[in-house]
Regions:
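Glycine-rich oxoanion-binding loops at beta->alpha junctions
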Residues: 10-11, 16, 21, 69-124, ...
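N-terminal phosphate-binding or glycine-rich loops at protein starts, especially the Walker A/P-loop
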Residues: 21-70
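Short glycine-rich or small-residue beta-strand-to-loop segments that form or flank ligand, phosphate
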Residues: 27-35, 91-96, 121-124, 189-192, ...
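Short, ordered loop/turn segments at secondary-structure junctions
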Residues: 33-36, 62-68, 97-98, 127-129, ...
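Short Gly/Thr/Asp-enriched flexible loops that form oxyanion-binding sites at enzyme active sites
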Residues: 42-47, 128-142, 202
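Short, acidic/small-residue loops that bind anionic groups at enzyme active sites
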Residues: 56-60, 138-170, 215-219
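Accessory alpha-helical/coil subdomains and C-terminal extensions
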Residues: 124-126, 136, 164-182, 189-289
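C-terminal non-catalytic interaction/assembly regions of soluble proteins
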Residues: 267, 271-368
Length: 368
């Protein structure tokens, strides 16, 4: 024991336990919240494999994110039931954008339902919203750990998130394929990728795919400059261009972010979409060149995770179950350099990890 304060277990101490004891066998819950992400199943597999085989824990999987513990929808997870899931995309537990903090008596409902399942703690795998809820629940006294995931790679407290590498590979392959049709038809092809607040996917896939312009949320763009770069390529005899744009990118005056039906989820996020189509119309009208838009959308979330994402997700899952064994509630395993370290959950949601100006400036060398 290291002397750090421990949050009490949900399960009342039995005759075998006088109180929280490091390395005792425990009963843990696990859930996956928010958008699905390649590598989620690798985390689940690692938690179950080490939790059951090494620590002797019992593992419960909640269905559909925070909705599972709110509605007591769960299943027992075993080594056998999680075999073969390592290469699978998505999550065997399902997911949702349910926000327990927005539900009437949500905290007390969670506390009551987790006690009813006789849990000692809960591991929440998710992004900004899921981990934000987990951090708030920890402050309410619930024994919760987090595992960071997002294809957007924008979580604070960690140098990288699993799912990002797979998303970049998918987007890069799409850009490679679109190059051939753009060149064949002398078209401007706009490729819209995910990235609400951070342009990591756009930047990395654009660089890897040889994009001629990359637009990200961190750098409001000048549509006139975008058109100038495209026209310069034409003047040099390059009659096609690839423009990669993150869904959250906006022009300098902030008027081209387009919302899909104005809908929001339970965490208050508006549904983004349409920036690619607006760019297509603006570029065609300003340059006279034929333009087309491809929105990659959810294909970036799906499919088989890359080897890098499988390994990172596995390492995070192993670290999470070890932290739960040591009752390190309110913490989150994070990638720091090449090491996995525990950091406070609050660090993950304190601020977004965005693209540094120098990274974007390096990409600008290849524009036009």
């Amino acid at each position: 024991m290291d002397g750090r304060p421990r949050t009490a277990s949900l399960r009342p101490p039995g005759p075998w336990r006088a109180g929280p004891v490091c390395c005792s066998s425990v009963r843990l819950g696990v859930l996956t919240g928010g958008g699905d992400c390649p590598g989620l199943n690798a985390v689940i597999r690692a938690i179950v494999r080490k939790g059951v085989d090494h620590h002797g824990h019992a593992i419960v999987g909640f269905r559909d994110g925070w909705r599972g513990p709110l509605e007591s929808a769960y299943e027992e997870l075993t080594v056998e039931s999680t075999r073969g899931i390592l290469p699978r995309g998505g999550t065997i537990l399902g997911s949702s954008r349910t926000n327990p903090l927005k539900r009437p008596d949500g905290v007390e409902t969670l506390r009551r339902n987790l006690e009813g399942v006789h849990l000692d703690g809960l591991i929440a795998i998710g992004g900004e919203d899921t981990l934000g809820a987990a951090s708030a629940l920890h402050e309410e006294g619930l024994p919760v750990l987090g595992v960071p995931k997002t294809i957007d790679n924008d979580l604070g407290g960690t140098d990288a998130t699993f799912g990002f590498d797979t998303a970049v590979h998918v987007a890069t392959e799409a850009i490679d394929r679109l190059h051939t049709t753009a060149e064949s038809h002398n078209r401007i092809l706009i490729v819209e990728v995910m990235g609400r607040h951070a342009g990591w996917i756009a930047l990395h896939s654009g660089l890897a795919g040889g994009a001629d312009v990359i637009l990200i949320p961190e750098r409001p763009f000048d549509i006139a400059e975008v058109c100038r770069l495209i026209e310069r390529r034409h003047a040099r005899g390059r009659y096609f261009s690839i423009v990669v744009v993150a869904e959250g990118a906006v022009p300098a005056e902030g008027t081209m972010e387009v919302l899909a039906e104005g809908q929001t989820d339970e965490f208050g996020h508006v549904r983004l979409g349409g920036i690619g189509q607006r760019l297509e119309r603006e570029i065609e009208s300003r340059t006279g060149f034929e333009a087309r838009t491809t929105v990659l959308g959810y294909v970036q979330r799906g499919g088989t995770p890359t080897a890098f994402d499988r390994v990172l997700a596995t390492r995070l899952g192993l670290a999470a179950v070890d932290a739960a064994t040591e009752l390190r509630w309110g913490m989150m395993p994070a990638l720091r350099g090449t090491r996995i370290e525990l950091v406070p959950l609050a660090d993950a949601v304190a601020e977004l990890r965005t693209v540094p100006p120098e990274d974007y400036e390096a990409a600008e060398v290849f524009f036009g």
